[in-house]
Amino acid sequence: MSKVCVLTGKRPKYGNTVSHANNHRRTRFEPNLHTKRIWIEEEKRWAKVKLSAKAMRIIAKTGTGELAKLLK
């Protein structure tokens, strides 16, 4: 299963974890994804999507219209 947000396109990033002794170790930083069931009013149906926390705030502010365009 992919770890990509449907709305924002956020995906895992790679970088270094740095210890107090300044040792660098490669790591993968995962996006804050949640699987949600969202009601799309325009199509009168439920959609199960993976959304980041930022995407959930966007939907709360603007509604599901933008999400409906992406799911087509």
UniProtKB/Swiss-Prot annotation:
One term of GO molecular function: structural constituent of ribosome
Transmembrane segments: none
UniProt keyword list: Ribonucleoprotein, Ribosomal protein
GO CC terms of this entry: ribonucleoprotein complex; ribosome
UniProt xrefs under SUPFAM superfamilies: L28p-like (SSF143800)
UniProt-listed GO biological process terms: translation
HAMAP family to which the protein is assigned, alphabetical: Ribosomal_bL28
Annotated protein name in UniProt: Large ribosomal subunit protein bL28
Species whose genome carries this gene: Chlorobium phaeovibrioides (strain DSM 265 / 1930) (Prosthecochloris vibrioformis (strain DSM 265))
